[in-house]
Regions:
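N-terminal start-of-chain detector that recognizes signal peptides
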Residues: 5, 50-52, 129
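N-terminal phosphate-binding loop and adjacent alpha-helix
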Residues: 30-71, 115, 121
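Glycine-rich phosphate-binding/catalytic subdomain of phosphoryl-transfer
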Residues: 59-246
Length: 246
């Protein structure tokens, strides 16, 4: 079991859980089909959609293991999550989602996209997380003052699984421009962003609320008891399994 790895991908129409062995060949899998919903002018998935979908895909994968090998899955060697990039999930200090998840499909940030592209001298597509954040600021949305964490779907799941507010550098490149010399956000652009919103007098700066950027092989946390309980409804999955950067 220590030589296995579990990969879970949250695509736009399907959530897939695949367990592989030491030779990287699939051992077992499970999936769950889902659809985004158009709600109040926003393409979204609810938190319930996310967790019931993840749990269903995991349960089917674990059942596949049981059926094929007569083993109750309690541990795997490692876990990795990936999900549709970009979009906007904003949370307060208590971990509450402040507004419904705004997915990559939304084209509601044109003003922010243009202004940030000019400010940074770097193309910022509408779907990027920072465009969503800046558009919420430009709109005067009251939730922005209460933000403690802004992340993507993969970043959210990693946080719930491990308690770590981290993403891999690939995921981060759809959040905010990445400096390939430092493998993190461009420091000068972060400073420009903070300066551009300084007149709002928020209690946070950009680096306070964005996920920390990791590269492949970096420690991205381990599965907590709470995370294991969220993923595996049977309660068989044990805590302590390492996760890679999402």
């Amino acid at each position: 079991e220590q030589k296995t790895a579990l990969g879970i991908e949250l695509g736009s129409t399907r959530i897939k859980a695949v367990l592989i062995g030491a030779d990287n060949a699939p051992i077992a899998s499970g999936d769950h089909e889902w659809e985004n919903r158009y709600d109040n002018g926003v393409w979204t998935y609810t938190l319930e959609d996310i967790w019931t979908g993840l749990q269903d895909a995991y349960t089917k994968m674990a059942a596949d293991v049981k059926e094929k090998y007569d083993i109750t899955l309690t541990r795997v060697g490692a876990i990795g999550f990936s999900a549709m990039m970009h979009g906007y999930m904003a949370f307060d200090k208590a971990g509450n989602l402040l507004v419904p998840f705004r997915t990559w499909r939304n084209n509601i940030t044109e003003e922010a996209s243009e202004k940030l592209t000019d400010l940074f001298g770097f193309h910022i597509p509408q779907r990027w997380t920072i465009a969503h954040l800046y558009q919420a600021i430009l709109n005067g949305e009251p939730h922005v003052a209460d933000i403690d964490y802004v992340t993507t779907l993969a970043g959210y799941i990693q946080w719930k699984m491990t308690g770590e507010r981290v993403v891999g550098v690939g995921e981060a490149s759809g959040i905010f421009p990445i400096d390939s010399e430092t493998n993190t956000y461009f420091a000068d652009m972060i400073a420009k962003f903070d300066e551009a919103v300084a007149d709002k007098a928020y209690s946070w700066k950009a680096l306070d609320v964005l996920p920390h950027v990791l590269t492949a092989g970096d420690n991205a946390g381990v599965l907590t008891k709470e995370g294991a309980a969220l993923l595996d409804m049977s309660g068989n999955l044990e805590a302590g399994i390492p996760l890679c950067p999402p």
